[in-house]
UniProtKB/Swiss-Prot annotation:
Domain (Globin) ranges: 3-147
Self-association and partners: Heterotetramer of two alpha chains and two gamma chains in fetal hemoglobin (Hb F).
Organism: Sapajus apella (Brown-capped capuchin)
Physiological role: Gamma chains make up the fetal hemoglobin F, in combination with alpha chains.
Residues that bear N6-acetyllysine: K60, K83
Entry GO CC: blood microparticle; haptoglobin-hemoglobin complex; hemoglobin complex
Residues given in the record as heme b binding sites: H64, H93
Tissues where the protein occurs: Red blood cells.
Modification Phosphothreonine occurs at: T13
Identification of the protein by name: Hemoglobin subunit gamma-1
Modified residues (Phosphoserine): S45, S51, S53, S140
Length: 147
């Protein structure tokens, strides 16, 4: 059973159709790494993350951010089964990468900020509420396989 209303789904999919995955993904992950520097420890292979400008200009940050948002696109197609959609990713992040599931919530909140910046007046309080519900659902699904 889905917690998403028809209005939520419309708000999420309508805005998603306008999102540039590469730009928004890179900015979202970059902001996460700048604002919450302890998250950098998961990205040792990305090279220099020594300053905000190094992070925001890092091609590996941009590429992984795009990968994250591409995965989010799958969630948007499967809003009624977020746990099923993210089952394997939850296992990977839990068992192999040992990522604290709280980081998924932080990333979702940063994404909402980036969407607000990129979409201005179109990002109404109602649209924000739908997106907050969605990123909270994704964070919960990604944390679902943790022991």
């Amino acid at each position: 059973m889905s917690n998403f209303t028809a209005e939520d789904k419309a708000a999420i999919t309508s805005l998603w159709a306008k999102v540039n995955v590469e730009d928004a993904g890179g900015e979202t992950l970059g902001r996460l790494l700048v604002v919450y520097p302890w998250t950098q420890r998961f990205f040792d292979s990305f090279g220099s993350l020594s300053s905000p400008s190094a992070i925001m200009g890092n091609p590996k940050v941009k590429a992984h951010g795009a990968k994250v948002l591409t995965s989010l696109g799958e969630a948007i197609k499967n809003l009624d089964d977020l746990k099923g959609t993210f089952g394997q990713l939850s296992e990977l992040h839990c068992d192999k990468l040992h990522v604290d599931p709280e980081n998924f919530r932080l990333l979702g909140n940063v994404l909402v900020t980036v969407l607000a910046v990129h979409h201005g007046k179109e990002f109404t309080p109602e649209v924000q509420a739908s997106w907050q519900k969605m990123v909270a659902g994704v964070a919960s699904a990604l944390g679902s396989r943790y022991h």
